[in-house]
Amino acid sequence: MSDMKIHFVVSPAEYAQGFGRQCIKQWGETNILKASYVVSIGGDGTALVAEQEALSAYLLTGQMLPVYVIDYSNTKEHVGALTNKGITTPQEIEGRIKEARKVPIYPLQADCILQQTNEQKSYFGINEITVKISRYEMTYMDVDILSKGKVKDSFYVAGDGIVIATPMGKTAYYHNLGGKSFQNDRLGLQTIAAKKNINKIIPDNHQVAIWVRSAHRPTCVMRDCNRTYQ
């Protein structure tokens, strides 16, 4: 048996869980901090969880683990845009990993400051970072786009929020909101149910500063559609 050290991330769906148990029986299960590879079994959502786990491990160890994503879903609604298809047995995993082409991913970093307490937290988004309402009340935001500390563009958002998408996320939530496609050296900004629909494509070395105006209207920060900060 190969000495590959694999950390598995498996969808909670029973269909994927069964295959996950077979894979762990074949390869064993390695703690992500000691693994050489991360293997995701499921769909796009499971892939994002695996990538977030790999990113968290990188922040602790300084080693970025490759994530190999196996498509394993039995639903017709499943998209699988991030997944590798055609794997039916655990024995195939080693060969497929060795044959795989590496695709670099550049996540977004969101630095959040709660103005009332000056509390600061940072989060990383693989597909997107979203700033949106956390209850059914419109939020108000001032948005600045900066390059090298200088403001290049500014606009105001009155609505449910805004999404900032990476090239990897341009076909996901951002796209469903009506955001236009863009090149791999760009980021996409798209408002959510705003009074004025705004879509902007900006260079990926620009920064986006978002100032939430209304403290009495709760607004949260989400990474890859998972709430992280409010």
Task: Give residue ranges: language-model regions.
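Short glycine-rich anion-binding loops that position phosphate/pyrophosphate groups of nucleotides
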Residues: 43-46, 73, 167-171
